[in-house]
Amino acid sequence: SANDVALQIAEQIGGSVDGFVQMMNNRAVELGCTNTVFTNPTGLPDDNQHTTAHDMALIMQAAIQNESFRTIAAATSYTIPATNKAAARNLTSKFTMTDTGSTGFYEGCIGGKEGYTEASGSTLVCAAQRNGMTLISVVLKGASGQTAPDAASILNYGFDQFVTLSLGDSDFSIISGGDVVVPAGTGADSLTTEDSQNGDQIDRTYLFNGTSVGSAVLEVVQSD
């Protein structure tokens, strides 16, 4: 898992491994992770380090907003250019769900990470996109060789049971957002909204049965 690289990145960005770990924990809090504590950047076992499937999903949700991350996560191979010390070297990704030659290949998978330690068991976090909807799957404490099929089952359930609605309003112009994920067969008339004024704009939250399913920033349309 290139943990040597993880440590080098930590020192480069955080000034030290401990400094980077503090940055990791601060960012986790910003993302809404309430049950995560990092003690190292490698993921190797530590009695004081822990997380949950929900928190891992929040972290993955933030990660895939970064285009550079998506490009790297989706890459199946990379060539390290030659230097005056070594010839070019080819690296091949071993991530099952983006490997077209693997039985675990999943159409639409953006990327992800598999892992294993005795303490955590087999784990897998991934994201996939189909028909304009992106879903995240997290498998923790899985059985050996079973995490990719389990992740695929979770994603299949999501894509089969939920749809994305793009909402509009004749009285408002949507500046950002406006897409919601709801159970299949649900119409816009099943949603309720909560609005808050933010200067000249309106921050709108869409709810389904009291649960937030999306948001939008709106601007009032001025009539002639």
Where are these regions (language model features)?
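Active-site-adjacent loops and short helices of periplasmic peptidoglycan-processing enzymes
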Residues: S1-H54, L58-E67, R130
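Domain-terminus/edge residues, biased toward the C-terminal soluble/receptor-binding domains
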Residues: C33-T34, D47-D224
